[in-house]
Design a protein with these regions (language model features):
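Short beta-strand-centered segments that line the small-molecule binding cleft or hinge
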Residues: 23, 27, 42, 65-69, ...
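N-terminal winged-helix
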Residues: 37, 43-74, 78-82, 87-91, ...
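Hydrophobic hinge/microswitch elements
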Residues: 85-90, 94-98, 104, 157-213
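A short LG(V/I)-centered, amphipathic sequence patch enriched
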Residues: 1-14
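Alpha-helical linker/hinge and terminal dimerization helices associated
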Residues: 2, 21-43
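A late-sequence structural motif
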Residues: 62, 213-249
Length: 249
């Protein structure tokens, strides 16, 4: 063993080894105190309410799992989730009706907001199994807009993106029906009322149990970024900051 102190008539005195041990012990106790303070602060912010507004694509594909894992880590934080179109998400954040907004790119009026990358998705063509295009491995927009289309309501960033490409390429689209949900689109397409464009995550889980097929869209616009919008770091509160960090980690 190593002697840590000398015994003297007047008491004890630390040896050089004892002095070294004292330094390390001081560091350890300081670290414990810092950790204790951090945990106390952590427990204080692990409750509260976070208002989240998100578009249909993110709610369908990504948020269920992300919010589930977050809620398990922070059961005392309540999340109020609303669905809106991407343009509606931006308005909601700007008007301070939401702490965190999740939307698809190519939406206007995002100035004065902090925009953060969240996820990415890929759009595919969805057709019934007997549709003439079903034998193709890939398609371009000019190949499928000639067929009757089932789309989302006005204001949807997905529909706006398709409409923009139709206009950009001087095409004409035969839009037959509009609906408000991916579920509605899947049902309409399976019933033979048209074809549609959906994010991969909104259709892949249903392929085995349906008569639907997907075809890759071989164009750059079919790859999208999903973004997060906040006013600024101070506007979302400590509970909101925990959720934001969880979403982007």
């Amino acid at each position: 063993g190593v002697n840590l102190f000398y015994r003297k008539k007047t008491g004890v005195e630390l040896t050089p080894a004892g002095l070294e041990m004292q330094k390390h012990c001081t560091k350890i106790f300081n670290s414990i105190n810092i950790m204790d303070e951090s945990i106390k602060e952590y427990s204080l912010v692990s409750s509260g309410i976070v208002r989240v507004t998100a578009n249909l694509s993110s709610i369908t594909q990504f948020l269920p799992e992300d919010l589930s894992t977050f809620s398990k880590k922070f059961p005392k934080i309540k999340i109020k989730l609303k669905e809106k179109t991407s343009s509606g998400v931006i308005s909601s954040v700007k008007e301070s009706l939401s702490d965190i907004g999740i939307f698809s790119e190519h939406v206007e009026n995002t100035e004065r907001l902090r925009i953060i990358d969240y996820k990415s998705d890929t759009l595919v063509l969805v057709v019934p199994e007997y549709q003439p295009l079903v034998s193709k491995l890939t398609v371009k927009i000019k190949d499928f807009v000639k067929f009757e289309m089932v789309g989302l309501e006005k204001g949807s960033s997905l529909q706006a993106m398709i409409d923009k490409q139709v206009q950009k390429q001087n095409l004409k689209m035969k839009k037959k029906l509009e609906t408000v949900s991916f579920e509605g689109i899947r049902g309409m397409v399976e019933a033979g009322l048209g074809i549609s464009v959906l994010p991969t995550g909104a259709i892949k889980p249903y392929l085995k149990s349906s008569k639907l097929k997907i075809i890759k869209i071989d164009e750059e616009w079919a790859k999208r970024s999903i973004k997060i919008a906040i006013k600024n770091d101070d506007s979302i509160g400590k509970a909101g900051a925990l959720l934001l960090n969880h979403l982007i980690s």
